[in-house]
UniProtKB/Swiss-Prot annotation:
Positions annotated to bind Mg(2+): 199, 213
Cofactor: Mg(2+)
Tree of life domain: Bacteria
Binding-site positions, substrate: 264, 321-323
Keyword Metal-binding: yes
The gene coding this protein: sucC
Name of the featured protein: Succinate--CoA ligase [ADP-forming] subunit beta
Record organism: Teredinibacter turnerae (strain ATCC 39867 / T7901)
Cofactor binding summary note: Binds 1 Mg(2+) ion per subunit.
GO terms for cellular component: cytosol; succinate-CoA ligase complex
Length: 389
């Protein structure tokens, strides 16, 4: 689960990290009045969306009057911001963050992530702040410094000092960096984070370190023990179909193709998309119905797939382990009848009671194409999507 920048900075402040004073406004009037609350004569206004690249898209602006703040808020509130990280529809803007201005001398990068290969939290730092870290990693990987956190010992001050020296920090900046590093490490563990980034972490004209941005991603599997963070969830930033799928414990990700896929198991779902692509098709989605695929969940899965108007055929690929294929077949039949599916449906069943499941489908009288193998299923659904079935 992602947080907005203003929410991330609230967390930073709780852990004693240096952040700008700011107000998250929901109306143009609130945004304009924020200038009086914050004081000063120059402010930064930022559209709040779960995407990077806001500055290049016009979603971040330096302003010098309340009128400019109000104009910016009117421009973006209720509209969608399109950046290189969003689709063509963009993300809806429901809040504007108004912040005090910071004089910048140098931009750095500081972030942390769970590294699956080492099974450790890894901190990354770089002198190349203010640009996409992925670009730095690709073009100049030697400029990314790392500190691996031992899960038993935790983050250590010497690791922070080592990074600070390599970043070229000196004097009081080393102490400030150490405090920021240890605060972030504590927050990462206590709040069950999966990723955090400060890009940029700046050195001000006065020589102090300051967190100018905040990107935070929380481990969705740990939200049950983070009720306060769960309340920060903004469903408007998610694809409507993905949000609906989550309510039914379905793992759904929208893609750009025209072949809907319904599969049990994430690995099989990825393999299914690969083989559809191999045979010339374009998957419209990733959809994992999970191990406990009931008729109700299959019905909802169909509804979600068919809500994508670009879908011209559906491939159901089920491997029966704990779940019996005959029960899945009954669920598919019930779903097709209830939803009123008008497009071709190809179904491949393997495993527990697969033969019985195939018989149930054959006896249903519905136009469901039974596949004998995964290759056959992919070939059939690609043909059907092209109208050759």
């Amino acid at each position: 689960m992602n947080l907005h920048e203003y929410q991330g900075k609230q967390l930073f402040a709780e852990y004693g990290l240096p952040v700008s004073k700011g107000v998250a406004a929901e109306t143009p009037a609130e945004a304009a009045s924020a200038a009086g609350i914050l004081g000063g004569d120059t402010w930064v206004v930022k559209a709040q969306v779960h995407a990077g690249g806001r500055g290049k898209a016009g979603g971040v602006k330096l302003v010098k009057s309340k009128a400019e703040i109000e104009e910016f808020a009117k421009q973006w509130l209720g509209k969608n911001l399109v950046t290189y990280q969003t689709d063509e529809n963009g993300q809806p803007v429901s809040r504007i963050l108004v912040e005090t201005c910071t004089d910048i001398d140098q931009e750095l990068y500081l972030g942390a992530v769970v590294d699956r290969s080492t099974r450790r939290i890894v901190f990354m730092a770089s002198t190349e702040g203010g640009v996409e870290i992925e670009k730095v990693a690709e073009e100049t990987p030697e400029k990314i410094l790392k500190a691996i956190i031992d899960p038993l010992a935790g983050a250590q001050p010497y690791q922070a000092r080592d990074l600070a020296f390599k970043l070229g920090l000196e004097g009081k900046q080393i102490k400030q960096f150490t405090q920021i590093f240890l605060g972030l490490a504590k927050m990462f563990k206590e709040k069950d984070l999966a990723l955090l980034e400060i890009n940029p972490l700046v050195i001000t004209k006065e020589g102090d370190l300051h967190c100018l941005d905040a990107k935070i991603n929380i481990d969705g599997n740990a939200l049950y023990r983070q009720p306060a963070l769960k309340e920060m969830h903004d469903p408007s930033q998610e694809d409507e179909r993905e949000a609906h799928a989550a309510k039914w414990e379905l793992n759904y990700v929208a893609l750009d193709g025209n072949i809907g896929c319904m599969v049990n198991g994430a690995g099989l779902a990825m393999g299914t998309m690969d083989i559809v692509k191999l045979h010339g098709g374009q998957p419209a989605n990733f959809l994992d119905v999970g191990g406990g695929a009931t008729k109700e969940r299959v019905v909802e899965a169909f509804k979600i797939i068919l809500s994508d108007e670009s879908v011209s055929a559906v491939l159901i690929n089920i491997f029966g382990g704990i779940v019996r294929c005959d029960l899945i077949a009954e669920g598919v039949i019930g779903a097709v009848e209830e939803v009123g599916v008008k497009i071709p449906v190809v179904c491949r069943l393997e495993g527990n009671n697969a033969e019985l499941g195939a018989k149930v489908l054959a006896d249903s009288g519905l136009n469901i194409i039974a596949a004998t193998s995964l290759t056959d299923a992919a070939e059939q659904v690609v043909k059907a999507a092209k109208g050759d079935a």
